[in-house]
Regions:
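A short, Lys/Arg-rich alpha-helix, primarily the initiator
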Residues: 6-32
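Residues that mark the N-terminal boundary/hinge immediately upstream of a DNA-recognition element
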Residues: 25, 36, 62-65, 76
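Short alpha-helical DNA-recognition segment
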Residues: 34-53
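Hydrophobic micro-packing sites on short alpha-helices
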Residues: 40, 65-73, 79-81
């Protein structure tokens, strides 16, 4: 059952859900500003590959990386975690 949920991108793991939510927020903000991953990478100093992995919740981001991303997208850190 657990692997069936994982294949559908669902999980009972709150940490995995948080990573997905953060990644989704970053991707939505980036796209709403019409930025490519490459452009965001230049603004943050992070690699395109790492940014892509964060957006897809395949890699967790450090606080430092999240700060760079939030700053580049003109977001408050709280917004990455679902705060208004």
């Amino acid at each position: 059952m657990e692997s069936a949920l994982a294949k559908k991108g669902l999980s009972k793991d709150p940490e995995a859900e948080l990573h997905r939510a953060i990644g989704r927020t970053i991707r939505e903000a980036r796209k709403s500003q019409e930025l490519t991953l490459k452009q965001l990478a230049r603004r943050t100093g992070l690699s395109v590959s790492l940014l892509s992995q964060i957006e897809r919740a395949e890699s967790s981001a450090s606080i430092s990386s999240l700060y760079k991303i939030a700053s580049a997208l003109r977001l408050r850190m709280a917004e990455l975690f679902g705060g208004a």
